[in-house]
């Protein structure tokens, strides 16, 4: 047995060999198994040596067989240690390929057809070499058919006629003949004759001409569908006057869209009907239901409105025979793009005439013998009169006659042909029997309708056939010659019903021939490009199957179609009833219209697809739409597309298997180039289809096509896209339609569909929405429409979202009608909701099953919306799939229910550790990670790369310490560190600098005096001596109290920040009392504040409460506060109002020395340095709100020394105190630092400053204030008020006397210029985006990022690190989120990765003096090396002395062993093992950076980067995520989201969300967006999404909690657990991490 380990092996392989040897020795492996696996490892190493840049697999080869590689780059301008290189042989492979770094996971392109036409590429594909002889066989373009100069117009020179000339002819020869009839929804008929039509049009033209408009000016035609006669008059009036018409109406466009059309076209004239004008006058706002006066709108004020209903006729036109100019542009129709954008289709005269001529030829070619009572041509001459009245055809139009196909083939085609058009309201078709009776009544010859309209008519008829008959009369359809049905795809079921169950049953002669689906391009003005014709001239069209030449139907293989191949089957056609599952029935539109060139193209490459392959249909002709109004770039792309011959010839030359085949393909391409030159312009139709026997078959629009990975079902009924799993014996991987060699070819023929690696293979398939819709609607009776689209995630994922319209879902109005306040009815409503939810669950489960059975697809989620709420395509009843997607992304879908299915996502794409039962900080993974980082670091050493024996070691993450043993007063050079307490320093200041200013109240005196309720004493410029007298006054009050206090008694000082507050603190310290400073209670949350106060009083056994006059007045004079205060008054000890104490000049502190020693002196043996004197209570964060910090005189002095020495505080720079005056750094700025440094301290009450900030801001501007401590919220408030004041001062400067004003009294934009150090505290990661937004919002105020200093503080240390005076802007690091999950710090270049594929952080600065920070693994207690993150440990003199835990339920103090241990932690390493550290519980890392300061000097800094707290990180499948990153992603999803909290509870990843106040938050849609973004950006699946009401926490809890969710995570989660939060809605998404672990372990076990 060979147990040797070759030394040349990489470290990871050496480790794996060791594991193998140990497994064999432990008898976990047989001899044969050991030898086999050893050989595999060594062979793999040899292969990797030949390909040195191939990454190795995961260390756990049984669990992870996927390739994994990262590219990294520096993201910031700073120079950092070069620790980021490719991990080529890294043994630390925690994550599977599902978590590939952002650099290697390109996003899916926005084009919906990307990678969908794989089989059109020549022979490409066969990466595995199974199809060696694939040859590129491009389809031959269909050329125009020359139909000859057939006289189609009975002697008219149609090719040169204009519509106004034709109208004039009809007026002259058919003046009394009815031109058109309009039937509204109520059945009222309105008609007009040719003479009235012409004369009224002339009247409109006259009105336009006299308005001094220019030729081709844009005229808005504002008419509804029922105003078809008035609309036709206005349109023809525009034609006659040479103007360009632009149809608009509220039935088609919103007001915003109409305003946009007016601006784009620069229209100044509107022709409008009376009905539409009344709509304008009675327009109401949808938000506040107030009347909107559009006439006063700036846009409409410049427009002239002319009502055409009352204009009358222009009789002068009878006398003259005018000559008409043929306008180039007839009208501009604004259609909507798939994404909802307006695009103006320019409809030109020659396009319209060609459409009419072509339709005339086609209808004439289809003339049948039973048409003999009609004339030979459908077009009637206009230059002479035909007496026979029955020769006219009756055209019954149910399409919108004011636009698109209804306008072209209805109104204008009727004018061109001289027949009778009857325009009916579309609502008539929805009534049973309505359409049939009108057809029979008017004996309609030609029906013009929409496929979905006709479908509803037939369904109504089949449900109740008697509705189409009456007792006196039988419906007879023998009059129908053609049924022209506008559509883009043919629903074969509808065709079957229309022909055989409607037309034929009701007497239509030759129904299959009459029914003619017409391929119309609604997005391009409604022109038609194909319909079944009998024009012949098909000699140049290719024949694929002569047996199917006369057939209009095809049966094609469904599985081949998924790979874009078209395989027809005659057998399936014969046995159509039994071949439904395997073959798809398609119906053709017919041949292209005669004058166009048509080809099928791969839109990705602009190359011809292989013959009988699906692609985008392109057409070329001089008589089709060729312009969008003022959209040049779009025009270039859409209308001037060219075939990429160079690419095709390149394939022929280089990609063919043999020279003979290459030559054959080249010759074929030469032929195509001759018949279709390279400079031919094509129009992209956005239709996906193919050509067979010269006929067009359309499968869908490009927007209705989506891609899916082929899935196989596992034995446990989960799904995977890994087709290699089929080799394990699972035969469901091969669909029925493909077996054996045929299946292999089907899979391998695509280059882009097959994705193969050493352990993975995927095949991408194309699916078409129409087929999905047909299946679901046919099998689920409550579903009526379906939309489906892919999420814009990484390109290989293809996550599908499906939206269904169902009758189970209620609209918003129906839901509101069901609301009630009656208890019984509410219970009943709740029961009904539960039943509805059960039905919804059953519905979505049924859809999931059906989609798998028939299409082998599994959507990621299904949303259920009410019926008729999804947007429809322009001028169609079909769903606008892309618009649905856009509404989904904008959270505008009224989703009532959503259900997810994630099994294949978990198995195929969810990032997870190979060791998903281990923490990334475990001893095992930490060891592997350090070995990997060490190997990387060693490989970048030049000596190592050159073969030298260098073995450099990675540095440990330690800040180093700058220890200051002493601190000296800047003036007297006295050692401040020799004093034992702050009181001794105070006395020294009083004796040496008694007349210098010590403290000052910053409150505006005027503001104080104006308020009768505030009796606080305001002390301005108090000297040291005067301050001592104030302290002495308070000492007298305490000493002489009738209820005496004794040494160590706890007392509470509760007041605003003021001079008297500081004096009271000092007085109590003199008395050796335990001082508990607390902020004043707030009226808004008085109940919670008083509860907290009573809890502290009872826990500490507080003997006295000292308050100022302002708080005393609030408690006693405010009715609301006093009512609440009386409930707790009995629990509160004596309250002393120290503001009432009078200051006497005769008093000094020294006078009380003996009294204090007698009454408050310590007992013998008491260690003063170990006795707490101050308790800091900080309730800002609920996690630590009940943990109170205790400080001794010694610890207070040490903290003051650190602040002074770090900030280099001097006596000549005044201090401003405004924030957090009762604890931490705020307490030190208020009470200690002024005394310690000798600087004057100005104390401001935050509430007063926010009321009137002028004095505070003027002080900052004019005084030499260098350092300022502000909370982020306070900074925002100050900037907001400063901005308002500066704007006010600017307005005042306009006054003439402003020059005389004192500039020191006015606020300038550089108000913060002198403040070099604005300290913003953060307990974890700095909120950099908030600060950036604040600075951007108030950019008028001069404030740079270098002035703002992040302070990293902890509950037990107010100053662990800071950025003060570094003289460099914050250092940006862009971290790879995929590496961060694994515990590794790896930078990326933000320019190289898409937004969201990095985590941006900034440093928290360097450590202060006398502080040592190390980064330690919290599980192993070993120091972390450079390149990984760990827990931040701090050894500092500023650490808290001790703590108390104040239990709110038991009202007592106690110590927690875990927290106690936290104060005296030691590392297990040999380095620094003698030091005791404070464990912060925060994760971060230290990085050495080189950067250039403002003086141009290069400085090296050990910067601390804080990532987040351990309790705010979560582990999912072995990977670590920071909830702050997840929550930021959720908040960025939609502006509706106000607050968000993510936590892990009971194995579930839970997200609590509070939406901003909005009329109708759409929570089902929002949930899906949240789940999608978390999955996309972080690779996590949310399990439960809960929406709380705006006032979501019950009255028993603080409403303020909801305002600051991030600071009150524990309280909110506890309230949720206790069901005290009112839930708006709750969505279950997945089943938790345990299910994912089960699926993964079961899957990997079977794949071993």
Curated annotation (Swiss-Prot):
Domain DMAP1-binding as annotated: residue spans: 5-101
List of residues that carry Phosphoserine: 99, 751
Membrane topology qualifier: Multi-pass membrane protein
Renumbered residue ranges of the record's region Fatty acyl-AMP ligase-like domain 1: 158-893
GO cellular component: cellular bud neck; cytosol; mitochondrial membrane; vacuolar membrane; vacuole-mitochondrion membrane contact site
A single GO molecular function term of this UniProt record: ligase activity
UniProt-annotated glycosylation sites, renumbered to this chain: 28, 71, 98, 128, 151, 209, 288, 328, 575, 644, 730, 881, 917, 995, 1009, 1198, 1301-1302, 1447, 1472, 1488, 1565, 1597, 1634
Source organism superkingdom: Eukaryota
GO BP terms in the entry: diacylglycerol metabolic process; response to osmotic stress; response to unfolded protein; vacuole fusion
InterPro entries in the record: AMP-bd_C, AMP-bd_C_sf, AMP-dep_synth/lig_dom, ANL_N_sf, Dip2-like_dom, DMAP1-bd, Mug62_dom
Biased amino acid composition, Basic residues: 60-71
UniProt note: domains: The fatty acyl-AMP ligase-like domains (FLDs) are essential for the redirection of the flux of DAG subspecies to storage lipid, triacylglycerols, probably via adenylation activity.
Function per UniProt: Homeostatic regulator of a chemically distinct subset of diacylglycerols (DAGs) with C36 chain length that prevents the toxic accumulation of these specific DAGs in the logarithmic growth phase, which otherwise leads to endoplasmic reticulum stress. Maintains the basal level of DAG subspecies by directly facilitating DAG to triacylglycerol (TAG) conversion process, possibly via adenylation activity of its FLD domains. Does not affect the abundant DAG species (representing over 90% of total DAG pool), comprised of C32 and C34 chain lengths. Required for vacuole fusion-mediated osmoadaptation.
Protein name (Swiss-Prot/TrEMBL): Homeostatic regulator of DAG
Native organism: Saccharomyces cerevisiae (strain ATCC 204508 / S288c)
């Amino acid at each position: 047995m060979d147990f040797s380990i070759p030394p040349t092996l990489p470290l990871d392989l050496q480790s794996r060999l060791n594991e193998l040897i140990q497994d064999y020795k432990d008898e976990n492996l047989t001899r044969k198994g050991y030898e086999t696996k050893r050989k595999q490892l060594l062979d793999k190493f040899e292969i990797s040596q030949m390909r040195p840049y191939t990454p190795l697999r995961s260390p756990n080869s049984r669990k992870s067989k996927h390739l994994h590689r990262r590219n990294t780059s520096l993201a910031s301008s700073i120079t950092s240690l070069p620790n980021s290189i490719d991990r080529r042989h890294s043994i630390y492979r925690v994550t599977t390929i599902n978590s590939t770094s952002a650099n290697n996971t390109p996003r899916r392109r926005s084009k919906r057809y990307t990678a969908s036409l794989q089989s059109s590429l020549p022979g490409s594909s066969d990466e595995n070499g199974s199809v060696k002889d694939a040859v590129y066989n491009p389809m031959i373009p269909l050329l125009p058919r020359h139909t000859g100069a057939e006289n189609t117009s009975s002697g008219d020179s149609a090719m040169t006629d204009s519509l106004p000339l034709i109208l004039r002819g009809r007026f002259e020869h058919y003046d009394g003949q009815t031109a058109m009839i309009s039937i509204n929804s109520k059945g009222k008929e309105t008609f007009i004759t040719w003479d009235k039509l012409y004369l009224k049009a002339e009247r409109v033209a006259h009105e336009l001409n006299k308005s001094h408009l220019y030729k081709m000016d844009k005229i808005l035609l504002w008419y509804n569908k029922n105003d078809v006669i008035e609309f036709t008059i206005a349109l023809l009036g525009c034609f006659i006057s040479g103007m360009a018409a632009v149809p608009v109406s509220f039935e088609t466009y919103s007001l915003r869209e109409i305003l946009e059309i007016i601006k784009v076209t620069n229209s100044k004239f509107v022709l409008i009907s009376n009905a539409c004008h009344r709509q304008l006058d009675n327009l109401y706002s949808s938000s506040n239901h107030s009347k909107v006066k559009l006439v006063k709108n700036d846009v409409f004020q410049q427009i002239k409105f002319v009502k055409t209903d009352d204009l009358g006729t222009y009789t002068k036109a009878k006398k003259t025979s005018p000559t008409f100019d043929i306008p180039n542009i007839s009208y501009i129709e604004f259609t909507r793009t798939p994404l909802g954008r307006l695009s103006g289709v320019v409809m030109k005269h020659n396009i319209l005439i060609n459409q009419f001529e072509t339709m005339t030829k086609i209808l004439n070619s289809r003339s049948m013998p039973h048409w003999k009572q009609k004339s030979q041509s459908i077009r009637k001459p206009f230059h002479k009169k035909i007496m026979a009245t029955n020769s006219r055809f009756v055209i019954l139009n149910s399409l919108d006659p004011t636009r698109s196909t209804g306008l072209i083939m209805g109104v204008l085609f009727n004018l061109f042909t001289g027949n009778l058009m009857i325009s009916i309201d579309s609502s008539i078709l929805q009534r049973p029997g309505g359409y049939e009776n009108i057809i029979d009544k008017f004996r309609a010859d030609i029906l013009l309708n929409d496929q979905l309209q006709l479908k509803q008519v037939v369904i109504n008829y089949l449900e109740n056939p008697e509705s189409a008959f009456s007792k006196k009369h039988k419906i007879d359809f023998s009059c129908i010659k053609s049924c022209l049905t506008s559509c883009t795809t043919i629903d074969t079921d509808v065709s079957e019903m229309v022909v055989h169950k409607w037309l034929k049953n009701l007497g239509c002669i030759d129904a299959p021939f009459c029914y003619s689906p017409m391929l119309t391009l609604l997005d391009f003005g409604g022109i038609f490009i194909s319909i079944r014709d009998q024009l012949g001239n098909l000699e140049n069209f290719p024949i694929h199957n002569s047996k199917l030449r006369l057939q209009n139907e095809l049966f094609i293989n469904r599985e081949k179609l998924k790979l874009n191949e078209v395989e027809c089957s005659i057998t399936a056609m014969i046995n159509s009833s039994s071949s439904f599952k395997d073959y798809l029935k398609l119906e053709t539109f017919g041949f292209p219209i005669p004058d166009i060139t048509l080809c099928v193209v791969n839109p990705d490459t602009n190359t011809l697809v292989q013959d009988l392959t699906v692609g985008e249909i392109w057409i070329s002709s001089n008589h089709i739409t060729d312009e969008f109004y003022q959209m040049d770039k779009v025009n270039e792309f859409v209308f001037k597309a060219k075939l990429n011959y160079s690419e095709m010839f390149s394939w022929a030359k280089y990609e063919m298997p043999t020279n003979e085949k290459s030559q054959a393909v080249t010759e074929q391409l030469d032929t195509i180039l001759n018949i279709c030159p390279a400079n031919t312009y094509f129009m992209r139709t956005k239709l996906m289809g193919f050509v067979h026997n010269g006929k067009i078959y359309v499968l869908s629009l490009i927007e209705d096509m989506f891609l899916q990975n082929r899935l196989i079902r596992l034995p446990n009924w989960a799904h995977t896209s890994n087709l290699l799993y089929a080799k394990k014996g699972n035969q469901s991987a091969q669909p029925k339609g493909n077996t054996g060699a045929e299946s292999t070819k089907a899979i391998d023929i695509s280059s882009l569909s097959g994705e193969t690696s050493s352990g993975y293979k995927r095949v991408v398939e194309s699916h078409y929405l129409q087929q999905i819709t047909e299946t679901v609607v046919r099998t689920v009776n409550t579903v009526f429409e379906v939309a489906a689209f892919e999420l814009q995630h990484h390109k290989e994922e293809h996550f599908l979202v499906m939206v269904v319209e169902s009758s189970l879902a209620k609209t918003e109005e129906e839901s509101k009608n069901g609301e009630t306040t009656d208890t019984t009815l509410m219970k009943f409503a709740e029961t009904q909701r539960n039943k509805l939810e059960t039905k919804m669950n059953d519905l979505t489960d049924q859809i999931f099953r059906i989609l798998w059975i028939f299409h082998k697809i599994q959507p990621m989620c299904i949303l259920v919306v009410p019926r008729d709420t999804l947007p429809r395509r322009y001028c169609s009843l079909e769903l606008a799939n892309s618009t649905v997607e856009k509404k989904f992304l904008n959270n505008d879908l009224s989703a009532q229910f959503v259900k997810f299915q994630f099994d294949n996502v978990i198995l195929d794409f969810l990032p997870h550790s190979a060791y998903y039962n281990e923490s990334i900080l475990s001893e095992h993974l930490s060891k592997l990670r350090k070995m990997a980082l060490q190997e990387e670091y060693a490989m970048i050493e030049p000596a190592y790369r050159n073969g030298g024996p260098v073995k450099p070691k990675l540095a440990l993450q330690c800040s180093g310490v700058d220890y200051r043993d002493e601190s000296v007063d800047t003036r007297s050079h006295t050692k401040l560190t020799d004093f034992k307490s702050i009181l001794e320093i105070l006395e020294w200041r009083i004796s040496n600098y008694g007349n210098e200013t010590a403290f000052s109240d910053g409150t505006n005196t005027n503001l104080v005096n104006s308020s009768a309720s505030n009796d606080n004493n305001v002390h301005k410029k108090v000297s040291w001596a005067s301050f001592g007298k104030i302290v002495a006054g308070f000492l007298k009050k305490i000493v002489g109290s009738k209820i005496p206090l004794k040494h160590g008694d706890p007392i509470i000082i509760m007041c605003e920040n003021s001079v008297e507050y500081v004096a009271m603190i000092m007085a109590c310290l003199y008395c050796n009392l335990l001082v508990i400073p607390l902020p004043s209670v707030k009226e808004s949350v008085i109940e919670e504040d008083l509860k907290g106060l009573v809890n502290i009083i009872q826990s500490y056994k507080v003997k006295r409460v000292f308050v100022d006059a302002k708080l005393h007045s609030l408690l006693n004079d405010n009715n609301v506060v006093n009512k609440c205060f009386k409930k707790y008054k009995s629990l509160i000890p004596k309250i002393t109002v120290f503001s009432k104490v009078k200051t006497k000049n005769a008093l000094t502190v020294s006078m009380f020395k003996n009294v204090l020693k007698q009454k408050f002196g310590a007992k013998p043996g008491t260690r003063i340095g170990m006795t707490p004197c101050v308790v800091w209570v900080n309730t800002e964060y609920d996690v630590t709100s009940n943990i109170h910090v205790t400080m001794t005189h010694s610890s207070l002095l040490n903290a003051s020394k650190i602040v002074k020495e770090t900030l280099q505080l001097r006596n000549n720079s005044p201090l401003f105190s405004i924030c957090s005056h009762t604890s931490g750094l705020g307490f030190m700025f208020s009470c200690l630092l002024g005394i310690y440094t000798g600087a004057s301290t100005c104390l401001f009450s935050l509430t007063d400053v926010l009321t009137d900030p002028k004095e505070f801001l003027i002080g900052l501007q004019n005084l030499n204030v260098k350092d300022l401590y502000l909370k982020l919220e306070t900074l925002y408030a100050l900037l907001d008020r400063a901005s308002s004041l500066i704007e006010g001062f600017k307005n005042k400067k306009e006054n003439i006397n402003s020059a005389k004003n004192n500039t020191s009294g006015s606020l300038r934009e550089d108000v913060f210029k002198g403040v070099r150090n604005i300290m913003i505290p953060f307990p974890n990661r700095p909120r950099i985006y908030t600060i950036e937004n604040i600075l951007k919002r108030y950019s008028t105020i001069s404030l740079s990022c270098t002035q703002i200093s992040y302070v990293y503080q902890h509950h037990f240390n107010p100053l662990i690190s800071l950025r003060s005076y570094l003289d460099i802007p914050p250092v940006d690091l862009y971290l790879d989120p995929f590496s961060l999950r694994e515990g590794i710090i790896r930078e990326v270049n933000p320019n190289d990765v898409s937004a969201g594929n990095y985590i941006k952080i900034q440093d928290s600065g360097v450590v202060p003096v006398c502080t040592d920070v190390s980064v330690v693994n919290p599980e192993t207690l070993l120091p972390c090396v450079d390149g990984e993150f760990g827990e931040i440990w701090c050894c500092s003199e500023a650490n808290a002395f001790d703590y108390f835990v104040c239990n709110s339920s038991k009202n007592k103090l106690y110590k927690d062993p875990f927290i106690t241990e936290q104060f005296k932690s030691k590392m297990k390493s040999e380095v620094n093992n003698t030091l005791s550290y404070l464990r912060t519980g925060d994760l971060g890392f230290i990085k050495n950076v080189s950067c250039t300061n403002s003086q141009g000097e290069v400085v090296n800094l050990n910067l601390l980067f804080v990532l987040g707290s351990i309790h705010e990180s979560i582990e999912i499948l072995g990977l670590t995520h920071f909830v702050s990153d997840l929550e930021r992603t959720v908040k960025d999803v939609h502006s509706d989201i106000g607050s968000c909290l993510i936590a892990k509870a009971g194995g579930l990843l839970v997200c609590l969300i509070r939406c901003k106040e909005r009329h109708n938050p759409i929570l089902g849609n929002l949930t899906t967006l949240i789940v999608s973004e978390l999955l996309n950006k972080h690779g996590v699946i949310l399990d439960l999404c809960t929406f709380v009401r705006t006032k979501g926490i019950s009255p028993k809890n603080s409403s303020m909690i909801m305002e600051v969710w991030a600071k009150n995570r524990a309280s909110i989660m506890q309230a949720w657990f206790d069901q005290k939060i009112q839930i708006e809605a709750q969505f279950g998404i997945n089943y938790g991490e345990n299910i994912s672990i089960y699926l993964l372990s079961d899957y990997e076990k079977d794949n071993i």
